[in-house]
Protein backbone atom coordinates (compact mmCIF):
# COMPACT_ATOMS: atom_id res chain seq x y z
CA UNK A 1 0.00 0.00 0.00
CA UNK A 2 1.25 3.48 -0.90
CA UNK A 3 1.14 5.90 2.04
CA UNK A 4 2.60 9.23 3.13
CA UNK A 5 5.33 9.66 5.72
CA UNK A 6 2.88 11.67 7.82
CA UNK A 7 0.54 8.67 7.94
CA UNK A 8 3.39 6.38 8.95
CA UNK A 9 4.23 8.51 11.98
CA UNK A 10 0.58 8.99 12.94
CA UNK A 11 -0.51 5.34 12.50
CA UNK A 12 2.71 3.46 13.10
CA UNK A 13 1.10 0.63 15.07
CA UNK A 14 -1.25 -0.15 12.19
CA UNK A 15 1.49 -0.27 9.54
CA UNK A 16 4.14 -2.02 11.67
CA UNK A 17 5.28 -5.22 9.99
CA UNK A 18 3.30 -4.51 6.84
CA UNK A 19 4.70 -4.04 3.37
CA UNK A 20 4.31 -0.40 2.36
CA UNK A 21 5.32 1.96 -0.44
CA UNK A 22 6.54 5.52 0.09
CA UNK A 23 7.68 8.18 -2.35
CA UNK A 24 9.93 11.09 -1.55
CA UNK A 25 13.16 13.01 -2.01
CA UNK A 26 16.53 12.15 -0.51
CA UNK A 27 17.51 14.61 2.23
CA UNK A 28 20.63 12.71 3.26
CA UNK A 29 22.38 9.44 2.53
CA UNK A 30 25.00 7.36 4.39
CA UNK A 31 26.90 4.36 3.04
CA UNK A 32 28.35 1.49 5.14
CA UNK A 33 29.84 -1.46 3.27
CA UNK A 34 26.76 -3.19 1.81
CA UNK A 35 24.33 -1.05 3.79
CA UNK A 36 22.69 2.24 2.82
CA UNK A 37 20.80 4.60 5.15
CA UNK A 38 18.56 7.05 3.30
CA UNK A 39 16.80 10.00 4.93
CA UNK A 40 13.63 10.40 2.86
CA UNK A 41 11.05 13.18 3.02
CA UNK A 42 7.83 13.51 1.02
CA UNK A 43 6.80 16.98 2.27
CA UNK A 44 3.85 15.80 4.36
CA UNK A 45 5.71 15.81 7.68
CA UNK A 46 8.55 17.66 9.34
CA UNK A 47 10.72 14.64 10.13
CA UNK A 48 12.64 12.63 7.58
CA UNK A 49 12.07 8.89 7.42
CA UNK A 50 14.92 6.40 7.50
CA UNK A 51 15.17 3.82 4.75
CA UNK A 52 17.58 0.90 5.26
CA UNK A 53 18.74 -0.87 2.10
CA UNK A 54 20.86 -4.01 2.62
CA UNK A 55 23.06 -6.22 0.46
CA UNK A 56 23.50 -3.77 -2.39
CA UNK A 57 26.37 -3.13 -4.76
CA UNK A 58 27.52 0.31 -3.58
CA UNK A 59 29.62 0.97 -6.67
CA UNK A 60 26.55 0.67 -8.91
CA UNK A 61 24.14 2.69 -6.81
CA UNK A 62 26.25 5.21 -4.88
CA UNK A 63 26.40 7.84 -7.63
CA UNK A 64 22.66 7.54 -8.27
CA UNK A 65 21.56 8.29 -4.69
CA UNK A 66 22.33 12.01 -4.63
CA UNK A 67 20.69 14.62 -2.39
CA UNK A 68 17.44 15.74 -4.05
CA UNK A 69 16.87 12.52 -5.97
CA UNK A 70 13.26 11.29 -5.93
CA UNK A 71 12.61 7.65 -5.10
CA UNK A 72 9.89 5.07 -4.78
CA UNK A 73 10.61 2.70 -1.90
CA UNK A 74 8.94 -0.65 -1.23
CA UNK A 75 9.60 -2.47 2.01
CA UNK A 76 8.47 -3.44 5.49
CA UNK A 77 7.96 -1.01 8.36
CA UNK A 78 9.92 -2.07 11.42
CA UNK A 79 11.13 -0.71 14.73
CA UNK A 80 14.76 0.08 15.45
CA UNK A 81 15.18 0.54 19.19
CA UNK A 82 18.69 1.92 18.70
CA UNK A 83 17.39 4.98 16.87
CA UNK A 84 15.77 8.05 18.46
CA UNK A 85 13.11 7.90 15.75
CA UNK A 86 12.61 4.18 16.12
CA UNK A 87 10.74 3.57 12.88
CA UNK A 88 12.35 2.66 9.60
CA UNK A 89 11.60 0.85 6.38
CA UNK A 90 13.66 -2.19 5.51
CA UNK A 91 13.67 -1.68 1.76
CA UNK A 92 13.19 -4.57 -0.65
CA UNK A 93 13.13 -2.47 -3.78
CA UNK A 94 14.08 1.12 -4.61
CA UNK A 95 13.02 2.75 -7.88
CA UNK A 96 14.69 5.90 -9.16
CA UNK A 97 12.00 8.41 -10.17
CA UNK A 98 14.05 11.53 -10.84
CA UNK A 99 17.80 12.00 -10.60
CA UNK A 100 19.77 14.84 -9.04
CA UNK A 101 23.46 15.73 -9.02
CA UNK A 102 26.13 17.69 -7.14
CA UNK A 103 24.84 21.01 -8.50
CA UNK A 104 21.65 20.67 -6.45
CA UNK A 105 21.88 23.79 -4.22
CA UNK A 106 20.18 22.42 -1.10
CA UNK A 107 22.66 20.22 0.70
CA UNK A 108 22.44 18.77 4.26
CA UNK A 109 23.79 21.89 5.97
CA UNK A 110 22.33 25.13 7.28
CA UNK A 111 21.52 27.63 4.54
CA UNK A 112 20.81 31.28 5.23
CA UNK A 113 17.30 32.57 4.55
CA UNK A 114 18.76 35.25 2.28
CA UNK A 115 20.38 32.56 0.12
CA UNK A 116 17.20 30.50 0.03
CA UNK A 117 15.25 33.56 -1.17
CA UNK A 118 17.32 33.39 -4.36
CA UNK A 119 15.91 29.91 -5.10
CA UNK A 120 12.23 30.16 -4.15
CA UNK A 121 11.36 27.27 -6.48
CA UNK A 122 13.51 24.92 -4.37
CA UNK A 123 13.56 26.36 -0.85
CA UNK A 124 10.33 24.62 0.24
CA UNK A 125 12.34 21.37 0.18
CA UNK A 126 14.18 22.55 3.29
CA UNK A 127 12.95 21.68 6.75
CA UNK A 128 12.33 25.36 7.58
CA UNK A 129 10.23 26.27 4.58
CA UNK A 130 8.42 22.96 4.52
CA UNK A 131 7.20 23.80 8.03
CA UNK A 132 6.27 27.36 7.04
CA UNK A 133 4.12 26.37 4.08
CA UNK A 134 2.38 23.54 5.89
CA UNK A 135 1.40 26.11 8.54
CA UNK A 136 0.28 28.49 5.79
CA UNK A 137 -2.01 25.80 4.39
CA UNK A 138 -3.51 25.05 7.80
CA UNK A 139 -4.10 28.74 8.55
CA UNK A 140 -5.73 29.30 5.15
CA UNK A 141 -8.16 26.43 5.68
CA UNK A 142 -8.79 27.43 9.32
CA UNK A 143 -9.94 30.90 8.25
CA UNK A 144 -12.38 29.47 5.73
CA UNK A 145 -13.63 26.98 8.31
CA UNK A 146 -14.15 29.68 10.95
CA UNK A 147 -16.31 31.86 8.72
CA UNK A 148 -18.25 28.92 7.30
CA UNK A 149 -19.02 27.78 10.83
CA UNK A 150 -20.17 31.31 11.75
CA UNK A 151 -22.65 31.44 8.86
CA UNK A 152 -20.66 33.70 6.53
CA UNK A 153 -20.87 33.36 2.76
CA UNK A 154 -17.60 33.29 0.84
CA UNK A 155 -17.61 35.72 -2.09
CA UNK A 156 -15.17 36.64 -4.83
CA UNK A 157 -14.39 40.29 -5.45
CA UNK A 158 -12.77 41.67 -8.62
CA UNK A 159 -9.03 41.84 -9.14
CA UNK A 160 -9.39 44.58 -11.78
CA UNK A 161 -11.00 47.77 -10.49
CA UNK A 162 -11.41 51.43 -11.51
CA UNK A 163 -11.37 52.52 -7.86
CA UNK A 164 -8.74 53.16 -5.23
CA UNK A 165 -10.71 51.69 -2.33
CA UNK A 166 -8.18 52.78 0.29
CA UNK A 167 -7.54 56.25 -1.12
CA UNK A 168 -3.82 55.61 -0.85
CA UNK A 169 -3.00 56.14 -4.52
CA UNK A 170 -0.38 53.34 -4.56
CA UNK A 171 -1.85 51.36 -7.44
CA UNK A 172 -0.63 49.13 -10.24
CA UNK A 173 -2.27 50.40 -13.40
CA UNK A 174 -3.33 48.00 -16.17
CA UNK A 175 -3.61 48.70 -19.86
CA UNK A 176 -3.95 46.77 -23.11
CA UNK A 177 -2.55 49.69 -25.12
CA UNK A 178 0.83 49.44 -26.85
CA UNK A 179 2.73 51.81 -24.58
CA UNK A 180 6.01 51.37 -26.42
CA UNK A 181 4.44 52.59 -29.67
CA UNK A 182 2.54 55.41 -27.95
CA UNK A 183 5.70 56.66 -26.24
CA UNK A 184 7.32 57.21 -29.64
CA UNK A 185 4.49 59.39 -30.93
CA UNK A 186 4.81 63.18 -30.87
CA UNK A 187 3.34 64.43 -28.67
CA UNK A 188 3.22 61.33 -26.50
CA UNK A 189 -0.38 60.97 -25.34
CA UNK A 190 -2.47 58.11 -24.04
CA UNK A 191 -6.19 58.03 -24.77
CA UNK A 192 -7.68 55.64 -22.23
CA UNK A 193 -11.01 55.74 -24.05
CA UNK A 194 -9.31 53.48 -26.58
CA UNK A 195 -8.18 51.10 -23.86
CA UNK A 196 -9.90 47.78 -23.14
CA UNK A 197 -12.29 49.19 -20.52
CA UNK A 198 -12.45 52.70 -21.96
CA UNK A 199 -10.93 54.18 -18.80
CA UNK A 200 -8.10 53.73 -16.33
CA UNK A 201 -8.17 50.49 -14.35
CA UNK A 202 -5.92 49.07 -11.64
CA UNK A 203 -5.09 45.93 -9.71
CA UNK A 204 -7.18 45.93 -6.56
CA UNK A 205 -5.88 47.09 -3.20
CA UNK A 206 -8.97 45.81 -1.39
CA UNK A 207 -12.20 43.93 -1.98
CA UNK A 208 -13.92 45.75 0.86
CA UNK A 209 -16.26 48.02 -1.07
CA UNK A 210 -17.65 45.18 -3.16
CA UNK A 211 -17.86 43.02 -0.03
CA UNK A 212 -20.00 45.72 1.61
CA UNK A 213 -22.43 45.50 -1.31
CA UNK A 214 -22.67 41.74 -0.88
CA UNK A 215 -23.05 41.96 2.90
CA UNK A 216 -25.99 44.33 2.49
CA UNK A 217 -27.75 41.51 0.67
CA UNK A 218 -26.37 38.30 2.22
CA UNK A 219 -25.90 39.56 5.81
CA UNK A 220 -22.41 38.18 6.50
CA UNK A 221 -19.75 37.64 3.86
CA UNK A 222 -15.99 37.44 3.49
CA UNK A 223 -13.57 37.64 0.60
CA UNK A 224 -10.09 36.14 0.67
CA UNK A 225 -7.71 36.79 -2.18
CA UNK A 226 -4.64 38.56 -3.53
CA UNK A 227 -4.29 42.33 -3.33
CA UNK A 228 -1.67 44.60 -4.84
CA UNK A 229 0.03 47.80 -3.73
CA UNK A 230 2.68 49.72 -5.65
CA UNK A 231 4.23 50.89 -2.41
CA UNK A 232 7.95 51.48 -2.87
CA UNK A 233 8.90 50.12 0.53
CA UNK A 234 11.77 47.67 0.70
CA UNK A 235 11.10 46.46 4.24
CA UNK A 236 10.56 43.06 5.86
CA UNK A 237 6.86 43.96 6.29
CA UNK A 238 5.87 45.05 2.79
CA UNK A 239 5.07 43.14 -0.39
CA UNK A 240 3.59 44.28 -3.69
CA UNK A 241 1.35 41.20 -3.87
CA UNK A 242 -0.16 39.70 -0.74
CA UNK A 243 -3.34 38.05 0.51
CA UNK A 244 -6.11 39.80 2.39
CA UNK A 245 -9.05 38.34 4.26
CA UNK A 246 -11.94 40.81 4.48
CA UNK A 247 -15.22 40.03 6.26
CA UNK A 248 -18.18 42.40 6.13
CA UNK A 249 -21.21 42.11 8.41
CA UNK A 250 -24.61 43.79 8.19
CA UNK A 251 -26.33 44.86 11.43
CA UNK A 252 -22.95 44.78 13.17
CA UNK A 253 -21.35 47.55 15.24
CA UNK A 254 -17.73 48.12 16.24
CA UNK A 255 -18.01 46.09 19.44
CA UNK A 256 -19.24 43.03 17.55
CA UNK A 257 -16.51 43.60 14.97
CA UNK A 258 -13.86 43.39 17.70
CA UNK A 259 -15.36 40.15 18.97
CA UNK A 260 -15.31 38.45 15.57
CA UNK A 261 -11.71 39.52 14.95
CA UNK A 262 -10.52 38.09 18.27
CA UNK A 263 -12.41 34.81 17.88
CA UNK A 264 -11.07 34.40 14.35
CA UNK A 265 -7.44 34.93 15.37
CA UNK A 266 -7.69 32.58 18.32
CA UNK A 267 -9.30 29.81 16.27
CA UNK A 268 -6.59 29.97 13.61
CA UNK A 269 -3.88 29.74 16.27
CA UNK A 270 -5.65 26.77 17.90
CA UNK A 271 -5.89 24.92 14.57
CA UNK A 272 -2.21 25.47 13.81
CA UNK A 273 -1.17 24.32 17.28
CA UNK A 274 -3.21 21.15 16.83
CA UNK A 275 -2.33 20.28 13.24
CA UNK A 276 1.22 21.62 13.02
CA UNK A 277 2.58 20.92 16.48
CA UNK A 278 5.86 19.43 15.21
CA UNK A 279 6.38 22.28 12.76
CA UNK A 280 5.80 24.93 15.43
CA UNK A 281 8.05 23.13 17.94
CA UNK A 282 10.78 23.07 15.28
CA UNK A 283 10.35 26.81 14.62
CA UNK A 284 10.40 27.44 18.36
CA UNK A 285 13.80 25.73 18.54
CA UNK A 286 15.36 27.13 15.37
CA UNK A 287 13.70 30.47 14.54
CA UNK A 288 12.22 32.05 17.66
CA UNK A 289 12.68 30.68 21.15
CA UNK A 290 9.36 31.12 22.96
CA UNK A 291 7.15 31.02 19.87
CA UNK A 292 5.07 28.13 21.16
CA UNK A 293 4.29 29.92 24.42
CA UNK A 294 3.48 33.17 22.59
CA UNK A 295 0.86 31.38 20.52
CA UNK A 296 -0.60 29.68 23.58
CA UNK A 297 -0.79 33.03 25.38
CA UNK A 298 -2.96 34.47 22.59
CA UNK A 299 -5.35 31.53 22.80
CA UNK A 300 -5.61 31.82 26.59
CA UNK A 301 -6.41 35.55 26.51
CA UNK A 302 -10.08 35.78 27.53
CA UNK A 303 -10.69 39.22 26.07
CA UNK A 304 -8.16 41.33 24.21
CA UNK A 305 -7.42 44.71 25.75
CA UNK A 306 -9.19 47.66 24.09
CA UNK A 307 -7.86 51.23 24.40
CA UNK A 308 -8.55 54.44 22.53
CA UNK A 309 -6.12 56.03 20.12
CA UNK A 310 -5.83 58.99 22.51
CA UNK A 311 -4.83 56.67 25.35
CA UNK A 312 -2.23 55.00 23.12
CA UNK A 313 -0.71 58.39 22.27
CA UNK A 314 -0.60 59.33 25.95
CA UNK A 315 1.19 56.08 26.82
CA UNK A 316 3.74 56.57 24.05
CA UNK A 317 4.31 60.26 24.84
CA UNK A 318 4.93 59.54 28.53
CA UNK A 319 7.11 56.46 27.95
CA UNK A 320 10.40 58.34 27.99
CA UNK A 321 11.48 56.49 24.85
CA UNK A 322 13.16 58.53 22.11
CA UNK A 323 11.15 57.19 19.18
CA UNK A 324 12.50 57.79 15.70
CA UNK A 325 8.99 58.82 14.61
CA UNK A 326 7.61 61.68 16.69
CA UNK A 327 4.48 60.96 18.72
CA UNK A 328 1.65 63.48 18.67
CA UNK A 329 -2.13 63.44 18.47
CA UNK A 330 -3.05 63.10 14.80
CA UNK A 331 0.01 61.06 13.84
CA UNK A 332 -0.34 57.51 12.61
CA UNK A 333 1.38 54.81 14.63
CA UNK A 334 4.71 53.61 13.26
CA UNK A 335 5.98 50.06 13.66
CA UNK A 336 8.18 51.11 16.59
CA UNK A 337 5.12 52.52 18.39
CA UNK A 338 3.09 49.36 17.76
CA UNK A 339 5.88 47.14 19.05
CA UNK A 340 6.40 49.26 22.16
CA UNK A 341 2.73 48.97 23.07
CA UNK A 342 2.49 45.21 22.47
CA UNK A 343 5.95 44.04 23.55
CA UNK A 344 7.04 46.49 26.25
CA UNK A 345 3.97 48.15 27.75
CA UNK A 346 1.12 45.63 27.54
CA UNK A 347 3.08 42.54 26.44
CA UNK A 348 0.02 41.14 24.68
CA UNK A 349 -2.41 41.94 21.83
CA UNK A 350 -4.33 45.19 22.05
CA UNK A 351 -7.14 46.79 20.05
CA UNK A 352 -6.83 50.53 19.44
CA UNK A 353 -10.14 52.21 18.64
CA UNK A 354 -11.57 55.70 17.98
CA UNK A 355 -8.96 57.12 15.62
CA UNK A 356 -8.83 60.73 14.35
CA UNK A 357 -10.94 60.87 11.21
CA UNK A 358 -8.24 62.78 9.32
CA UNK A 359 -5.93 59.75 9.20
CA UNK A 360 -8.54 57.12 8.38
CA UNK A 361 -10.51 56.22 5.24
CA UNK A 362 -13.62 58.07 4.08
CA UNK A 363 -15.98 55.13 4.63
CA UNK A 364 -15.40 54.87 8.39
CA UNK A 365 -18.27 55.95 10.65
CA UNK A 366 -17.98 59.22 12.53
CA UNK A 367 -18.21 58.97 16.30
CA UNK A 368 -20.60 61.33 18.14
CA UNK A 369 -17.70 63.72 18.85
CA UNK A 370 -17.35 64.23 15.05
CA UNK A 371 -13.57 64.22 15.53
CA UNK A 372 -12.90 60.50 15.62
CA UNK A 373 -14.16 57.47 13.72
CA UNK A 374 -15.28 54.04 14.92
CA UNK A 375 -12.11 52.40 13.65
CA UNK A 376 -10.08 49.57 15.12
CA UNK A 377 -6.55 48.28 14.70
CA UNK A 378 -5.43 45.03 16.30
CA UNK A 379 -1.77 45.17 17.27
CA UNK A 380 0.08 41.99 18.22
CA UNK A 381 3.61 41.38 19.54
CA UNK A 382 6.43 41.19 16.97
CA UNK A 383 4.18 41.98 14.02
CA UNK A 384 2.46 45.22 15.00
CA UNK A 385 -0.74 45.92 13.08
CA UNK A 386 -2.40 42.66 12.07
CA UNK A 387 -6.01 43.75 11.51
CA UNK A 388 -7.54 47.06 10.51
CA UNK A 389 -11.26 47.68 10.39
CA UNK A 390 -14.18 49.86 11.34
CA UNK A 391 -17.87 50.34 11.56
CA UNK A 392 -18.80 51.73 8.14
CA UNK A 393 -20.58 55.06 7.68
CA UNK A 394 -24.21 54.19 6.89
CA UNK A 395 -25.54 57.76 6.62
CA UNK A 396 -25.66 58.94 2.99
CA UNK A 397 -25.37 62.67 3.69
CA UNK A 398 -22.44 62.20 6.06
CA UNK A 399 -20.65 59.90 3.61
CA UNK A 400 -21.04 62.37 0.73
CA UNK A 401 -19.75 65.19 2.93
CA UNK A 402 -16.68 63.15 3.91
CA UNK A 403 -15.95 62.33 0.27
CA UNK A 404 -16.13 66.02 -0.60
CA UNK A 405 -13.80 66.92 2.25
CA UNK A 406 -11.28 64.32 1.06
CA UNK A 407 -11.74 65.35 -2.60
CA UNK A 408 -12.90 61.88 -3.63
CA UNK A 409 -14.80 62.03 -6.97
CA UNK A 410 -18.42 61.13 -6.22
CA UNK A 411 -19.20 60.01 -9.77
CA UNK A 412 -16.95 56.95 -9.53
CA UNK A 413 -18.62 55.88 -6.28
CA UNK A 414 -22.31 56.35 -7.11
CA UNK A 415 -22.81 52.60 -6.93
CA UNK A 416 -21.29 52.61 -3.44
CA UNK A 417 -23.54 55.48 -2.37
CA UNK A 418 -26.54 53.48 -3.61
CA UNK A 419 -25.90 51.12 -0.70
CA UNK A 420 -26.83 54.03 1.59
CA UNK A 421 -29.71 55.22 -0.58
CA UNK A 422 -31.55 51.91 -0.57
CA UNK A 423 -32.03 50.13 2.75
CA UNK A 424 -28.91 51.31 4.53
CA UNK A 425 -28.05 49.83 7.92
CA UNK A 426 -25.17 49.73 10.35
CA UNK A 427 -22.44 47.40 9.14
CA UNK A 428 -18.82 46.69 9.95
CA UNK A 429 -15.83 44.80 8.71
CA UNK A 430 -12.07 44.48 8.79
CA UNK A 431 -9.06 43.36 6.81
CA UNK A 432 -6.51 40.78 7.91
CA UNK A 433 -3.10 40.73 6.25
CA UNK A 434 -2.61 36.98 5.83
CA UNK A 435 1.17 37.12 5.51
CA UNK A 436 1.46 39.19 8.68
CA UNK A 437 -0.57 36.53 10.45
CA UNK A 438 1.91 33.96 9.18
CA UNK A 439 4.84 35.99 10.54
CA UNK A 440 3.19 35.72 13.93
CA UNK A 441 2.45 31.99 13.56
CA UNK A 442 5.96 31.06 12.39
CA UNK A 443 8.19 33.45 14.34
CA UNK A 444 9.80 34.67 11.13
CA UNK A 445 10.48 38.37 10.63
CA UNK A 446 10.44 38.83 6.85
CA UNK A 447 7.30 38.70 4.72
CA UNK A 448 9.37 37.25 1.85
CA UNK A 449 9.71 34.06 3.87
CA UNK A 450 5.99 33.31 4.23
CA UNK A 451 5.06 33.79 0.55
CA UNK A 452 6.10 31.01 -1.81
CA UNK A 453 7.05 33.35 -4.66
CA UNK A 454 7.25 36.87 -3.17
CA UNK A 455 6.72 39.96 -5.30
CA UNK A 456 8.40 42.88 -3.54
CA UNK A 457 9.97 46.24 -4.33
Swiss-Prot record:
EC number: 6.1.1.22
InterPro entries: Aa-tRNA-synt_II (IPR004364), aa-tRNA-synth_II (IPR006195), aa-tRNA-synth_II/BPL/LPL (IPR045864), Asn-tRNA-ligase (IPR004522), Asp/Asn-tRNA-synth_IIb (IPR002312), NA-bd_OB-fold (IPR012340), NA-bd_OB_tRNA (IPR004365)
Catalytic activity, reaction form: tRNA(Asn) + L-asparagine + ATP = L-asparaginyl-tRNA(Asn) + AMP + diphosphate + H(+)
Major enzyme class: ligase
Lineage: superkingdom: Bacteria
Primary subcellular site in the record, as a coarse category: cytoplasm
Signal peptide positions (record): none
Gene3D superfamilies: Bira Bifunctional Protein, Domain 2, Nucleic acid-binding proteins
Alphabetized CDD domains for the sequence: AsxRS_core (cd00776), EcAsnRS_like_N (cd04318)
GO cellular component: cytoplasm
Coiled coil ranges: none
Molecular function per GO: asparagine-tRNA ligase activity; ATP binding; nucleic acid binding
GO biological process: asparaginyl-tRNA aminoacylation
Keywords attached to this entry: Aminoacyl-tRNA synthetase, ATP-binding, Cytoplasm, Ligase, Nucleotide-binding, Protein biosynthesis
Locations listed in the record: Cytoplasm
Keyword Signal: no
Subunit structure: Homodimer.
Sequence similarity: Belongs to the class-II aminoacyl-tRNA synthetase family.
UniProt-recorded name of the protein: Asparagine--tRNA ligase
Source species: Phytoplasma australiense
The organism's taxonomic lineage, starting at the top: Bacteria, Bacillati, Mycoplasmatota, Mollicutes, Acholeplasmatales
Amino acid sequence: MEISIKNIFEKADFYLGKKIIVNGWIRNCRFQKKLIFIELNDGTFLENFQIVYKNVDLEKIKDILQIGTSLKVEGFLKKNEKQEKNLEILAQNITLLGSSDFSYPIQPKKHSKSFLRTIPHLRTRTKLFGAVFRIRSTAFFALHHFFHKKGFFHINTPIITPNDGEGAGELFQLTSLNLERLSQEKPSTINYQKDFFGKKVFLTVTGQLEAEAMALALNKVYTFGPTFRAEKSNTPRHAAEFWMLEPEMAFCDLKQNLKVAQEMLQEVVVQCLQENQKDIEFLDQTVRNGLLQELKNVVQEKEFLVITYQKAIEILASSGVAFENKVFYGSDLATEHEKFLTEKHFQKPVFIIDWPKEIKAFYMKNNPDQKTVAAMDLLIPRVGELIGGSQREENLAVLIEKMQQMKIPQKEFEWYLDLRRFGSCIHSGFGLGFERLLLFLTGLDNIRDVIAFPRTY
